[in-house]
Amino acid sequence: MSSLFRVGGDAYDDFMGRYSTRLAGPFADFAGVEPGQRALDVGAGTGALTAELVARGVSVAAADPSPEFATVLRERFPNLEVEEAPAESLPWGDGVFDVALAQLVVAFVSDAPAAVAEMARVARRVAVCMWGIAEVDMFAAIDRTDSVIGTSRTEPRRYRTPQEIHDLLAPLGEVESAELDVTAGYRDYDEFWQALQRGVGPAGHWIASLDAEALERAHQELFRQLGSPSGPFELRARAFAGAVMPG
C-alpha cells in the first residue's frame, strides 16, 4: 500500500481529496457513527474521514502505514492519537472502539481478510468501502485511455464490487451493504491533468511511467474520453460499502 502513496498530503488532497471528503459523510452515516462514540480510522490517509468523525463529536484515533500520511495526520489533528501502523496489525487492545472504519483502503492492503479481522478485534462494528472501477468516471476514462494508447496500466481490482465487499466481511457476521455516490468538480481539464500528474496511487504511477510521446497521447485521449470539457466539469464516483457487527 505505502509504495503507491508515498506522496505529500497536498498531492493526495489535490488528486483524491476532492472525492474522499465528499464520501466521508455518507460513509459515516452508513457506518452508524454517533456523537460520543470512540472510532478508529484505519488507513486514514490525509484525514478526510478523520475530519468528518471529529466534526460529529466522536472520539477518534487514526492509523496509517505511510510515514508521510502519519505526519500529516499529526499536524492536522494534534490532539488525536495517531499511529503509524498497517491495517493488519493495529496497536490497540481488544474491543476498545465502538466502530472501526476503512475508507478506500482494503484494495491496497497486503492481506485484506487479516485487516478486517484485526478491525473486528479492536471494534464492535466494522465498516469498509472501496470505489468501483467502472463506477468512477475518472478511473473508467483512464482505463479506456490506457486501452486506446496501448500502455500497461495496473490497478488493484479486488474488493471493487458489492459481492467482493460482502464476501470479505461475511466471515465476521451478517453484512449490511450500500452504494455511496459522490461527485467532484474541476475548474477545467488542466486542473484535472495537473492533479493526475501528482503521482498519487495507481493512476498517478501510470502517468509517471509514460515516456514523453505516450504522455502526450494520454493527455489528448483522456481529454476526449472525458467529453472534451471546455470549462468546469464534474465527475461521478460510486463506492461500495459494507458493515458488520462481529459476533
Predicted regions and their residues:
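A conserved beta-strand element that flanks and buttresses the S-adenosyl-L-methionine
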Residues: 101
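Short catalytic micro-motifs in class I SAM-dependent methyltransferases
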Residues: 104-107
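Conserved class I S-adenosyl-L-methionine
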Residues: 125-151
